[in-house]
Swiss-Prot record:
Database matches in HAMAP family: Pantothen_kinase_1
Natural source organism: Shewanella oneidensis (strain ATCC 700550 / JCM 31522 / CIP 106686 / LMG 19005 / NCIMB 14063 / MR-1)
Amino acids binding ATP: G95, S96, V97, A98, V99, G100, K101, S102
Gene3D superfamilies cross-referenced by the UniProt entry: P-loop containing nucleotide triphosphate hydrolases
Cellular component annotations (GO), alphabetically ordered: cytoplasm
InterPro entries: P-loop_NTPase (IPR027417), PanK (IPR004566), PRK/URK (IPR006083)
Name of this protein: Pantothenate kinase
UniProt keyword list: ATP-binding, Coenzyme A biosynthesis, Cytoplasm, Kinase, Nucleotide-binding, Transferase
Length: 316
């Protein structure tokens, strides 16, 4: 299979699902149906066959790459005459709202932690690095939430830099999708994992995307391997609307929810509002900031109907 995108054709090896699945090479399935149920996100239909065909080969590839990095580190440590360093391997996972980044990240975390070379795999989402709700309101950024300027990039870079440098304990803020805000006084502590998976909308951005100050470091400067989860925009919008309806019946019904006022909407009203949110916020953010970074990824997972992976693109 060859990509129709000329840039992708030049940069990537392209695999159809069947071609990619044979690269599993006898890697055992370690997840049960119940495990997978616990990892699924809202409105996602990931099956065990999807894990077998797509995620197990990817787990094998990443294991080989991480082992090679570890061996290189040992050689360098021996050359420098120093004790083995403890710098974790950092994987970033990017893509649009509603594409299924979080589920992909959780499945990868579960599979990668089964390998003896890297049993400690942590997962951090960049949602926690969004400015607090009060700050977004004060800055007039509430309708730009998810855009690059809505993140505390200084805090995020300091976090990822601390992890990469091998600091014993580094804290990341925790985000609540119920209150639509950071949780005050709570944090996730990352303590020298073998692998860190960093999942978020804009983790592939570089200095090319920030002409104001290209001298400052970016998250992508600290990443060893990057993944982009891709889908056609009409599918993304459809999945967002379906997820919005699911939230209306679930999370939005919580009186503490920032979006509790949506809980009483009819299906038609909810669909109209979800479409408007997509057209005014999520769609423009995808077109302006997220999708343009796609071809910087080392690997692209392309989804088709029903959230099923159809193709995998691997950097040459």
């Amino acid at each position: 299979m060859t990509s129709k995108n000329p840039i992708q054709k030049a940069l990537y090896l392209a695999f159809e699902r069947a071609q990619w699945s044979v690269l599993r090479d006898a890697v055992p399935m370690t997840l049960s149906e119940q495990d997978l149920e616990n990892l699924r996100g809202i409105n996602e239909k990931v099956s065990l066959s999807e894990v077998t065909d797509i995620y197990l080969p990817l787990s094998r590839l990443l294991n080989l790459i991480v082992k090679a990095k570890q061996q290189r580190g040992l050689v360098l440590d021996e050359f420098l005459g120093q004790k083995p360093s403890s710098s974790p391997y950092i994987i970033s996972l990017a893509g649009s709202v509603a594409v299924g980044k979080s589920t992909t990240a959780r499945i990868l975390q579960a599979l990668l932690s089964q390998w003896p070379e890297h049993p400690k795999v942590d997962l951090v989402t960049t949602d926690g690095f969004l400015y607090p709700l009060a700050d977004l309101k004060r800055k007039g950024l509430l309708q730009r939430k998810g855009f690059p300027e809505s993140y505390d990039m200084k805090m995020l870079v300091e976090f990822i830099s601390g992890v990469k440098s091998g600091q014993p304990h580094v804290n990341a803020p925790i985000y609540s999708h119920v209150t639509y805000d950071r949780i005050r006084g709570q944090h996730q502590t990352v303590s020298q994992p073998d692998i860190l998976i960093l999942e978020g909308l804009n983790v592939l951005q570089t200095g090319l995307d920030s002409p104001v100050d290209i001298r400052r470091p970016f998250v992508s400067d600290f990443v060893d391997f990057s993944i982009y989860v891709d889908a056609e925009e009409h599918l993304l919008k459809q999945w967002y609307q379906e997820r919005f309806l699911q939230f209306r019946k679930g999370a939005f019904s919580d009186e503490k929810s920032y979006f509790h006022h949506y809980a009483s909407l009819t299906d038609d009203e909810a669909n109209t509002i979800a479409a408007k949110i997509w057209d005014t916020i999520n769609g423009p953010n995808l077109q302006l900031n997220i999708q343009p970074t796609r071809e910087r990824a080392h690997l692209i997972l392309q989804k088709g109907q029903d959230h099923l992976m159809s193709h995998v693109l691997l950097r040459k």
